[in-house]
């Protein structure tokens, strides 16, 4: 099976689960990124950093261009449930946000120090200053300013990451991806730590998948 086909199948398994179990999260998925936008992203990376768009990220963006949080009336006051944050690593970044982080201050050199990676996932929507990257060696974590070497991948690929997410959702154990476990609230898939939850008012409505 080709890497692209593996990614497509892994993504479909996760999104099919969302469609059946977390329809508000499923509604958060944005359409695929247009070809000209992908070409522009690849060209920017090559111009400023000397490497092109990672093949898996190109393939993912051809399936989904990121997410847009949906309006949830019960969530209006506190706004603590982001319908698009359905992965344990947060939201899928679109090209503009991903390259905005990777090309930060590129006119003065690469603040990341040169790794051929691009961020694609973050829980830090206000920044982002942390998240997951993807490169030829796989998927790992990054954070500013001290963890930008990007040389210790946790998964061999985005597809492997998505496979692990799907296994956690369908088979468990619930903490297979870390202390945050999958749960459902107001039609959304949200990962939280039952021992130290970030959810506040929404917590009483959040129910673990397992």
Annotate each language-model stretch with its function.
Residues 1-41, 63-210:
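A C-terminal-region feature
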Residues 42-47:
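Alpha-helical scaffold elements that line and support the substrate/ligand-binding pocket
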Residues 53-56:
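Conserved hydrophobic ligand-interaction patch in extracellular adhesion modules
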